[in-house]
Amino acid sequence: MDSVRNFYDTIIKSSHPLVLSLHLAGKAIPVAFYLLGGWFVSYTSHFLIITILLLAVDFYLTKNISGRKLVHLRWWHNATGTNEDGSPFVFESYKQYPDYSGPAVNPIDSKLFWISTYAAPALWALFGVLCVLRLQFISLFLVLFAAGLTGYNAYGFRSCDRWEPNKKSSETSSIWPQMPTFTNVENIQRLFTFQTFFRNG
C-alpha cells in the first residue's frame, strides 16, 4: 500500500500528471493484455488485433503527445530520404528555442518517460526470447512487432534528444546510427503508410 501511495505522490509532482499517467498506462496496458488477454479473448485473431491496436495507440500517444509534453521532444520520419546530418528523422526540440520562457522539463516527467520508453522494447524482447524457448511462433510474431514498434519510438526520441540544432551538419553527422537503406523500396514503403498518419499528429 505504501508503494502505491508513493507512486501516486510521484505522479502528483509531475507537471502533467494526466499525460504522464496516460503515457505509463499506454506502456502497461499492451503488456498486461498480452499476459492476461488470453483468459478473456478466445480467438487468436482477435487477440492479435486487439494487442496491435493497443500498441498503435501507445505509439501515437508517446510520439505525438507525451513526448512533446513531458520532455519537449518530437520526431517524425523523413519520407523524402535522409537529412544533411545523416538522420532519417525530422526533429522538434526545446533546444531550438533558447529564448523560451516557459516551464522547464520536470525531472520526474523526464525520468519516468525515459525509463518507460526504454523498458518497453526491452520487456518485449524478453517476451520474444521466452516465445522462442517455448516454440510459440504466433506469439513470437506479435512480440517482434511490439518490440520493433516500441524500439523504433525509443530510437526516434533518443536521436531527437541527442540532436544539436545549432551545430553544423558536419559536426553532428557522426552521432547518428545509420538506418539501413535499400534501392527500389517504394513499394515496401507503401506498406507502412501508417507512418504518414502518425506524422501529422
Curated annotation (Swiss-Prot):
Glycosylation sites: 64, 78
Stretches that traverse the bilayer: 18-37, 43-61, 112-132, 137-157
Keywords: Glycoprotein, Golgi apparatus, Membrane, Transmembrane, Transmembrane helix
Membrane-related topology note: Multi-pass membrane protein
GO terms (BP aspect): protein secretion; vesicle-mediated transport
Main location: Golgi
InterPro entries for the chain: TVP23-like (IPR008564)
Cellular component, GO, one term: Golgi membrane
Keyword Transmembrane: yes
Coiled-coil boundaries: none
Compartmental location: Golgi apparatus membrane
PANTHER family, alphabetized: GOLGI APPARATUS MEMBRANE PROTEIN TVP23
Role played: Golgi membrane protein involved in vesicular trafficking.
Similarity section: Belongs to the TVP23 family.
Listed name of the protein: Golgi apparatus membrane protein TVP23
Organism of this sequence: Eremothecium gossypii (strain ATCC 10895 / CBS 109.51 / FGSC 9923 / NRRL Y-1056)
Gene that this polypeptide is encoded by: TVP23
